[in-house]
């Protein structure tokens, strides 16, 4: 029986506040000294982990008692996490270190709804927590045979450089052919709505340059700790816009740099992105990579990234300067640049986020919060709707979680029926919090077909139809799950403008609207004849990077041609063509190309049955 391990730490406050001390975070004035005393109560037969999965800390801040709740960040590392560094003679060394029992936590202050915390417990307690709107830092005091820690406000750290740091992004460093246009809920196609509702995961890779290696004393352990501390905060920030950041790997250029890292940010970013595409992507699958550098960029720039380039093999990249001793300020810069990768530009003066400064403010200040502004959230949503980047949809499996299952962490994991938290916090009458199994007599604890611990009756509607290709989903009476059903693939839809495929109706009209806005339409047939040329944009498919011209019967399965009804555009044959993402703007597989025919994945207009039985994964139902 797995039980929650609750650890209580009592912190006794030293009877005086220090006036000045030099810590890892810098020269600190006005700090409190605390002594953690760990009290552990393990259930009988439980195995002691090196780092517990759930902990509490009791301490006084400004003389007032607070309780800090912490849970291990189980999403920090991917299952295939790896590290690469180089020997003194330049030999590449790649390892897969054990990261299951890691020491990085997130949490909050009890009775403070807006509080956050990011703490490492590797060697004492190091990190920060937000209390009543103010940021506090905690780190061990380096005293012999002492467990003393310092707690202090960020404002009490002496600043080495008073000049504010800024992001180098102006408008866009990767020129997209078209601006992001606002999309209302009613204008969304079924595909866009489904994409928007799906959970998002960024498989993140981090590279540290040679200056970083030298800066941290040529000590790989010290440098990797710095990186883990930073990414743990990045995870916490991006979670605010429902993006999970999983660290899939890191590379430390311990021998020499793989590119010429220089003080001109735009040049360094371009060189890093080129190296990433040519080298890194061939050895490690990931969705986005950043370079963390110890070089000082020209001017106040702290980072730079390509805007809206997530998942792009060339441009899904960013660079960040390790500009401050306090890792959470570096993490804010990194999260900011990752926000650019995810389609978010800088906040304007009218943008708000219930804090003095939001994540996407152009200037990184000591008041920076972990909140995204209303503008950022809207811009990110519009980017997702318009571009639907696919690499962030790949959700890790339950078996990919690197930490062992823990009853009481609110995640239903392998071997558990339910998980409602600890016995003290559980409010679920269906779930036994001591073993994460259903209570006696209960059939279920959650699910669209679960009501008061019992399965809903067979035939009960659990999800209405979302489109004409969808069907109302019904409970079976034997499960809490609401199984997704949809109309037969190949059934005509949208007034015979398309054929159903797995609950959606892919049509050229919807694809034009997604590319050019709500008033767009499909071009005349004559425009599609350009696909017979087999040039850089007009083709049906590629074979070994050679573009194959469309046969006459297949011209509507190549590049999509649309009418953009905006007053300034008189061109009857508009396309979207991006040299770095050539598949964008092609007619999607499954789209109707003639009566009774649909495009397959090879750019051929074939019979409906053949299209849905081709290698695209379509299946006739």
From Swiss-Prot:
Q: Which UniProt keywords are listed?
A: Calcium, Cell adhesion impairing toxin, Disulfide bond, Fibrinogenolytic toxin, Glycoprotein, Hemostasis impairing toxin, Hydrolase, Metal-binding, Metalloprotease, Protease, Pyrrolidone carboxylic acid, Secreted, Signal, Toxin, Zinc, Zymogen
Cofactor(s) needed, names only, are: Zn(2+)
Note on cofactor? Binds 1 zinc ion per subunit.
Q: Output the superkingdom of the source species.
A: Eukaryota
The listed location of motif D/ECD-tripeptide is: 468-470
Residues forming the propeptide are: 21-191
For biological process, the GO terms are: proteolysis
Give the protein name, as stated in the record: Zinc metalloproteinase-disintegrin-like TSV-DM
């Amino acid at each position: 029986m797995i039980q929650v391990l609750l650890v209580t730490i009592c912190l006794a406050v030293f009877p005086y506040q220090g006036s000045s001390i030099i810590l890892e975070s810098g020269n600190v004035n006005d700090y409190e000294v605390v002594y953690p005393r760990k009290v552990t109560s393990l259930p009988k037969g439980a195995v002691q982990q090196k780092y517990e999965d759930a902990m509490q800390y009791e301490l006084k801040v400004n003389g007032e008692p607070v309780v800090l709740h912490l849970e291990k960040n189980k999403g920090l590392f991917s299952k295939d996490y790896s590290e690469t560094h180089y020997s003194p003679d330049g030999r590449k060394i790649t390892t897969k270190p054990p990261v299951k029992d890691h020491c990085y936590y997130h949490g909050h202050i009890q009775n403070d709804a807006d509080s956050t915390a990011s703490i490492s417990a590797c060697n004492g307690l190091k990190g920060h927590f937000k209390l009543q709107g103010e940021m506090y830092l905690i780190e061990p005091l380096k005293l012999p045979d002492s467990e003393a820690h310092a707690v202090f406000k960020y404002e009490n750290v002496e600043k080495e450089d008073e000049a504010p740091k800024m992001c180098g992004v102006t408008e866009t460093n990767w020129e997209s052919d078209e601006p992001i246009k606002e999309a209302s809920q009613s204008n969304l196609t079924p595909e866009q709505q489904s994409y928007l509702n799906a959970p998002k995961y960024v498989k993140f890779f981090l590279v540290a340059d040679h200056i970083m290696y030298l800066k941290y004393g040529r000590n790989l352990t010290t440098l990797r700790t710095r990186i883990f501390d930073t990414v743990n905060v990045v995870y916490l920030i991006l979670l605010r816009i429902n993006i999970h950041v999983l660290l899939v790997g890191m590379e430390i250029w311990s021998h020499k740099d793989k590119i010429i890292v220089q003080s001109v940010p735009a040049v360094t970013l371009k060189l890093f992105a080129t190296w990433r595409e040519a080298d890194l992507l061939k050895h490690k699958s990931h969705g986005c990579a950043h370079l963390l550098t110890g070089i000082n960029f020209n001017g106040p720039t702290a980072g730079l990234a390509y805007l809206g380039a997530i998942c792009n093999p060339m441009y899904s990249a960013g660079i960040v300067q390790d500009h401050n001793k306090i890792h959470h300020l570096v993490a804010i810069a990194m999260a900011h640049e990752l926000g650019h990768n995810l389609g978010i530009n800088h906040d304007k003066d009218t943008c708000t986020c219930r804090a003095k400064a939001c994540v996407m403010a152009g200037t990184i200040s000591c008041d920076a919060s972990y909140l995204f502004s209303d503008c950022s959230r809207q811009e990110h949503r519009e980017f997702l709707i318009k571009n639907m980047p696919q690499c962030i949809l790949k959700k890790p499996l339950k078996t990919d979680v690197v930490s062992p299952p823990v009853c009481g962490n609110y995640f239903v994991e392998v071997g558990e029926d339910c998980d409602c938290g600890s016995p003290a916090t559980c409010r679920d009458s269906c779930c036994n919090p001591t073993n994460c199994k259903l209570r006696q007599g209960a059939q279920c604890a959650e699910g669209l077909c679960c009501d008061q611990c019992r399965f809903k009756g067979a035939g009960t509607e659990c999800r209405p139809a979302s489109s004409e290709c969808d069907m109302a989903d019904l409970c079976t009476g034997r499960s809490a799950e609401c199984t997704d059903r949809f109309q037969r693939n190949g059934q005509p839809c949208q007034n015979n403008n398309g054929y159903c495929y797995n609950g959606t109706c892919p049509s050229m009209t919807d694809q034009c609207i997604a590319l050019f806005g709500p008033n767009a339409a499909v071009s005349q047939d004559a425009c599609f004849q350009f696909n017979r040329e087999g040039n850089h944009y007009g083709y049906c498919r590629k074979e070994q990077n050679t573009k194959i011209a469309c046969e006459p019967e297949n011209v509507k399965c190549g590049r999509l041609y649309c009418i953009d009804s905006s007053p300034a555009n008189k061109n009857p044959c508009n396309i979207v063509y991006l040299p770095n993402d050539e598949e964008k703007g092609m007619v999607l597989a499954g789209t109707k190309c003639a009566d009774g025919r649909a495009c397959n994945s090879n750019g051929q207009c074939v019979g409906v049955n053949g299209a849905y039985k081709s290698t695209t994964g379509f299946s006739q139902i």
